Amino acid sequence: MLNRIRSVFAGERGLPRSQVERLGRLPPGERLAGVGAALHDLCVTTAARFVEEEHRRADSPFGGLPKTDLFHEMLVMNFWALERLFKGRRRALMDQVYDRYSTSFVWGWESGRTDLVDSMRAKFTAYDEAWDDYSGHQDGFARQALAIIFGGTPVAEAPRAAFWLISYADRTMKDFTEVGKSVKLLLRDAA
């Protein structure tokens, strides 16, 4: 099994090979929680990398946003990408991801896990309705994401911000497709 997982990650897109090997050695009953934690951490790392890159660039359209707010919205976008990848077939795994999220990132909110997940799912629905798998034109998605990220405030650099959000979402989905292959192998015999 480990050799098949290694072959999936030859390009190291997604989870690092060493992490996949470690997860593959977990007993099947512990593997679901381990994979959920790894996916959560991957989403966090990916969102944090985007925020840091954007805040380093002097001409970033996201430069005026607080890092924590931008990070949270990019994290939600990553969770949406995972939901799209699994198409509802990995509910127990996504519950592990959201449990870790709700205990790690409360942002001072007064709400509990259910309210946090419901809030994210409303954004997922908006993103799903706007994403165009058929034509590949993602202007509607970009408008929706900009409205969520900027709270409906007009964005002076909207075309550039839209470009970066579409590029980010597309790249993340492609990278997560590779992650999905290892998840399938890792959870094949897990409880």
Task: For the regions a language model picked out, list residue spans one by one.
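Non-catalytic accessory regions used for complex assembly or targeting
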Residues: 1-38, 187-191
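Residue-level signal for alpha-helical context at structural boundaries
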Residues: 53, 57, 96, 115, ...
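N-terminal interaction modules that seed assembly of large macromolecular complexes
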Residues: 45-92
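Hydrophobic/aromatic-lined pockets within catalytic cores
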Residues: 83-86, 106, 188
